[in-house]
Every structure is written in structure tokens, then in C-alpha cells.
């Protein structure tokens, strides 16, 4: 990849990071524990800026000794290849994809050392990342092939993976339970602890009802259980994404509703008509977007990586929700890329 500079080289701001900011890394004080190392830096102010990263065994970055990664959309990066033992230097710049060139000064040069026998943990680039991913459903926990295997093992051992306890405690309670109504807002929209706690529990149980009935229905080939799970799912999909279970109203409720709908969309995909899939996916997209927008645009966890709710929602909500629909919704794939790169790099 070219790392040539534009004729109009802009100033590159490199502010000193605070204790709670993402750091410039690696440097010569960093103990590298995996190969390749993870590269992080403070983002520039410009929205949607892209970067070019150069890594070299030569401090002058001669072409022969330098690897260059361009058009990086985030201020953190994991290369798709490992490095040989040795001393390396790296720096970054702002990238213009139209001109295929660096358009700013290069950053301060930092140094790191790769030693022998480090765990090999490269990250496949975005272009090829999903090439070998199955597009069948379900995707969360078990694939169709693993479901077949699970059924076979359950026939030879009725308590395989503690199935009896799972069915008794996590499936049976939902067989007769009526479908949950949409939670009501707080009285006068003033948060009250007992209502917060009870609705939190109710939304957690929404996950249990949809997920556990759907799993048991598939494993036991029980149409009644699948129909019950579907009824819960379609009801939740009709709830107002901007209502009491929106992220802005009460994030802990919103997280659980989004996760419940994600499991339902995935495990009941074959039980839904095309119109029902559209309904459920529209709801899931709206709820996932609320979380993604908060994480990426408002909490800015790629700059402030210690916001507990925002960071937790990446693995708890964004990843499972986006896994279920990455091949159907372009934005979901973008959010999944962000989540994968954040979790693996930062």
C-alpha cells in the first residue's frame, strides 16, 4: 500500500493523553504479550477521519523494511499478520482515501520489541473477515450442525450438559406464563427504584422466555414451544423502540430487550415469515442503533474506554445483535467490525 504524502501536508495534533484516555501504544516501555501488538493513539478532532499506519524495522521507514496499512477508520488497529522477532518503529498519519495519500505530518515515532514464542493473534481485515462465516441460523451459541450433534448426544444421555436442570428451571416456568406486556414508563417519568428494579427483572426474564423456549423447541423439536417463543418475540418487536425501553430512557432495560429480540430473531428465523422477519429486524436495528450511537458517537469509548455501561454494552448487546444480521444490514456489519476491533485491540 502506498504511504506517499499529499502536497498539502496538514498539522497533526498529538495531545498528551490523560489517565482515562486511550494511550499511544506500543512504545519501548510496553511489554508485548501477543503477536502482532495492538496499536492505539488519540483520535483527531475531525469526524470520520481515517489513518495510515506504518511499521518498520528501519527508523527511517525505508520502503523495503516498512509495512503500511492505509484507510484505517478507527484510532486503533490490529494487523492481519504477525511480526518476526526484532525491534520495530511505528507512526501514523491522517489518510485521504480519494488521493490514496497521507495528508498530515507523521506522528512521533515509537519503538517496540517483538520476542520469540508470543501467542499469534492477528486479526483478519474487514474485506475478508466474514468470507468463511456461515449465513445460516442460528448463530448464537449453536449452529445448525451443532444442534444436530447436541440432539444426538441428548438421545444417548438425557442429562447431557445438565439438560434436565435447564429444562426444569429455565424452560418450564415459561410454558404457561402469559406473554409480557410492554413496560410502562415511570409515574410522571420520574425514576423510582422499585419500578426500575422490577422492570429490570421483567426485561431479563424476556430474554429467558424467548431464548430458552426457542432453544428447547429446536432441541426437542417441539412446535408448541417454538410457537410460544415466537409469540413473546413478536410482542416485544411491536414495542416502541423510543418508549420506556429505549436506551435513553433506561439503558439497562433497553440492553435486555435488544438482546432478547436478537436471540429470537436468530433462533426463530426459520419460524418467521418474511414479513415477520422484517418486523423483528426493524425493531432490532432501531434498538441496536441506539446503543451503537451512544457507544461510538456520545460515550466515545475509543477515546474514553472506561465508561462501564457503554463498554459493557459492546459485548453484551452490539456483538450478539450484529452477529444475527451482519449479512442483511450494512450498518450492523459496520458496528460488528467496530466491536470486534475494539474488543481485540483496546
Task: Report the location of each language-model feature.
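Low-complexity, Ser/Thr/Pro/Gly-enriched N-terminal "stalk/linker" regions
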Residues: 117-191
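Recognizes extended acidic, P/S/T-rich segments that occur
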Residues: 50-87, 97
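Aromatic-lined, polymer-binding surfaces characteristic
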Residues: 183, 196-346
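Residue-level recognition of well-ordered beta-strand positions that form the cores
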Residues: 40-42, 54, 93
